[in-house]
């Protein structure tokens, strides 16, 4: 009986683990290398000091990087529409707490990256050190 309980516990833990690499794969978006640092003391990024504010940093990733202050931390997503060919749309725009695709007008939450389509926003890792935000993959 004890072995069965341990087996069930082990299988439960194993199944609850997720692979962020697998869930972040998207056939529409290439895997560009991202290594970006921004300082929130600079005027272009000072809005990131406040919850529910975001900025788009161009010339990184596929169509730029969206950085968003989610309150409990920062989220970073590619600004390319995740359900469209990367060459068919311009960068997404920020509308409050959502990113909106320029092609199909789909809205994606900047808290979760989820929208109403097959693929969520492509998410990047974030580290914060003082006023510097480092985004990478």
Residues of each region from the PLM?
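A sequence/structural signal for flexible, mid-protein segments enriched
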Residues: 18-19, 102
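N-terminal pre-ligand scaffold of iron-sulfur
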Residues: 20-96, 107-110, 122-137
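C-terminal motif of bacterial Sec signal peptides marking the signal peptidase cleavage site
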Residues: 13-16
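Positively charged n-region of N-terminal signal peptides that target proteins for export
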Residues: 1-4
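Extended Gly/Ser/Thr-rich low-complexity repeat segments
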Residues: 112-119
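Sec-dependent N-terminal signal peptides
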Residues: 7-8
